[in-house]
Every structure is written in C-alpha cells, then in structure tokens.
Amino acid sequence: MPKVSVIIPAYNRAHLIGRAIRSVLNQTYQDFELIVVDDGSTDNTEEVVRSFNDNKVIYIKHERNKGAPAARNTGIRAARGEYVAFQDSDDEWLPEKLGKQIKAFKTASTEVGLVYTGFWRIEGDKRTFVPSPNITPKEGAIHDALLKGNFVGTPNTLVKKECFEKAGMFDEKLPMLEDWELWIRISKCYCFKYIDEALAISYYNPGSLNKPRSLMEAQTLKLMLDKHFEDIKRNRGLLASYYRRIGHLLCLNGQIAQGRGYLKKAVMTYPIDVKSFLLALISLFGQRSYNKAIQGYKRIIRCC
C-alpha cells in the first residue's frame, strides 16, 4: 500500500494538467499513488493523463460534472494511503514538498492531523508568499484563527486520512471555499503543523472578483455562518465581520436591500466597528450611490 494518496481533480484542463502531474511524479519522496479524478471533462484530459503511462497514476472519470468538492471526495474514497494530499490541475509542487511533510509528521505529536507549507501565489507578474507573516498562530490549535479566514490553502496540505473519518469530507453543497470550511472542521479535532517554506505554486488569473463569483461567495459565507454559528458567535467582532462581508458582497451584486440588512446586523452586533458603520451608511443612499462610493474608496473594499 502507498503511504500517500495524491488527489488531482480536473475538468477540461488538458492544456494544464501535465505540469501538475509532472510536479507530483518528480517528488523526491516516491511512496505515493496519484489519483486523477476527471470531473466529466469534454476535452482530451484523459488522453493527457494516460500519456504518462506510470503505474503510480490512477485515472477515475465522473460521467457528469459534479464540481471540485465531489471530485476530491471521490479521490478520498478511492485513496489507499495513510495520508492524503491535494493538488490542483493548474498548480505545481516543488520536488521536496511531500518528503518534508512526511518528515514533519514523523516528529509531530499524534494530535497533529494536517501539515501544510507556505506557497507562492502567482497572479500575472505578481508573486506573493502565503500565508502572510502577520497571521498568528499558524500551527497548533488554530480553530479560532481559521474561523477568521483561510490561510492554509489546498495544494500545500498533507492530511491524515483518519481526519476525514472523524471530521467528514468536502461539503459538496458549498458553491466555493469548501477547502476552508473543511479545515475549520478538522481544526476542531486536530492540531495543525506549519512548514515555513514555499513548497507549492498556485496560479491565479489576474482581475477583480466578478459579480457571479461575488454572489457565490456571499451564498457560501451564509452557509458557513449557519454551519459554524455556535463557534463564530462567541466573538462578536468576528460575527460582525461575517455579516459585513456578506452584506458588502450582496450590495456589490445589486441586492442592496438584502445587503443593507446584513450591514445593519453587523453594526448592531459590534457597534464600534467603523467599517460596518461606513458601509451601512453608504447603502442607505441606494444601489448607484453604493457602487460609485465603493469605486471611489478602494480602501473600504480592501478592509472588508
């Protein structure tokens, strides 16, 4: 049995997936299987995967497109390894990524269920190291820190398979951010360990959040708030930040009345939060005024 199961979900990524697969096969640590879950692709993704002709590579295909969370869950169910790693079809690993994570697990407490590394975020000509040095704590019992935002990532993680048995798998009902939500659940049961070194590269398309995606994020945050409300409400400032983010995204997406309602909730929950107050005030002047004000005050967007 392989020690590690690496899972790559793919949907119409024939032009990119070769790079991701090569970066996995070129690891210095070689005790792994690579499970590629083709999520109903209509291009030649299968042809590219099979061209590697490597007995480590296992190809599974969904008859129809089900989304990345479902594809990853299919991979988890098929995994034979003690540990599970995730790679995205358009990203890549540095050669020592798996080896250093396995070494970290060997020296870690049995309470550690996930080891993650730093990674480079490439967006156009801009390269950023993630997670930010300002984020603390990065390891140990980090459940409260993760409730505030996702600094863990996905292609840079190595997870004990037992974590999925205890905390569950990816939530297929979430429109996006399903990795963050899973890490929140796992962090309630296990400690995390961090390697302060960039061992993966994630590529992002440059550009701002578009309207359909911003609405998806608002819907996702609503679901996450419902799911983890008991933990989030213990910190009134944190609860207000969820309300504020949801409200702001809804307002940006043309749902000014509903968005204003969430912004009012944010103000009522944590009255000393200036950001919530300013956004709620701007929303009172209607959709056009809100859009113009936000375009004119980029700082507000960055704070939300």
Model-derived features: positions:
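C-terminal subregions of glycosyltransferases and related glycan-biosynthesis enzymes
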Residues: 1, 204-304
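N-proximal low-complexity "stem/linker" segments adjacent to membrane-targeting elements
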Residues: 1-25
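Acidic helix N-cap motif at the loop->helix transition within catalytic regions
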Residues: 15-18, 43-51, 92, 96
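A conserved acidic beta->alpha catalytic loop
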Residues: 23, 30, 38-47, 64, ...
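Glycine-rich, basic loop-to-helix element that forms the pyrophosphate-binding segment
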Residues: 62-79, 100
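Conserved nucleotide-sugar donor-binding catalytic segment
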Residues: 77, 134-224, 243, 250, ...
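Short aromatic/hydrophobic "clamp" motif used to bind/position activated sugar donors
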Residues: 84
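Conserved donor NDP-sugar-binding/catalytic core segment of glycosyltransferases
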Residues: 96-129
